[in-house]
Structure formats: structure tokens, C-alpha cells
Amino acid sequence: MDVKETILNIIQELFMEDVSEMMDEDLLHAGVLDSMGTVELIVELESRFNITVPVSEFGREDWNTANKIISGVVELMHA
């Protein structure tokens, strides 16, 4: 399973939402993520990908869509 597929599965598992058709939609504004959900997602991403997500960066514009989350994880994996 690739990074994109894994992240989409994580989001679906945690929030019961299939975001594969809304890859560029703001997940906070769409109601998929809230503050607690964001923490859950960070913990799961760190666990699954063996990365450290800077919490101060996660809620910003560069982590608000599925595509941006995928890009951020890939970047952290290669850091």
C-alpha cells in the first residue's frame, strides 16, 4: 500500500469519511477534522510512518487537505 492509500485509509478508519473524492477540500471546514481529530490523526500518522509531525505546523494551510497531508508526510519521511 502506498502513502496516499494508507493516509486515505487512516482518515476513513478514524473519521468514517471517504475523502478520496475531496482531495483538495479543506478537511477542517468540511467537518472531517476538528481539534481532537487532528491530534488523533497526527498520532496515527507518526505511528504508521515513523515520523514526527510538528504540531505547530499541522493546523496551518499546508496541512488542511488530504493532498497536503500526503505531501507533508512524504516530505517528513525524506527529511
Curated annotation (Swiss-Prot):
It is found in: Cytoplasm. It comes from the Bacteria. One of its GO terms (cellular component) is cytoplasm. The modification O-(pantetheine 4'-phosphoryl)serine is found at residue 35. One of its GO terms (molecular function) is D-alanyl carrier activity. The keyword Cytoplasm applies. Pfam families: PP-binding. Gene3D superfamilies: ACP-like. GO terms for biological process: cell wall organization; lipoteichoic acid biosynthetic process. Residues 1-77 form the Carrier domain. Keywords: Cell wall biogenesis/degradation, Cytoplasm, Phosphopantetheine, Phosphoprotein. Coiled coil: none annotated. 4'-phosphopantetheine is transferred from CoA to a specific serine of apo-DCP. Pathway: Cell wall biogenesis; lipoteichoic acid biosynthesis. NCBIfam families: dltC, PRK05087.1. Belongs to the DltC family. This is D-alanyl carrier protein. It comes from Streptococcus suis (strain 98HAH33). The lineage of its organism: Bacteria, Bacillati, Bacillota, Bacilli, Lactobacillales. The gene is dltC.
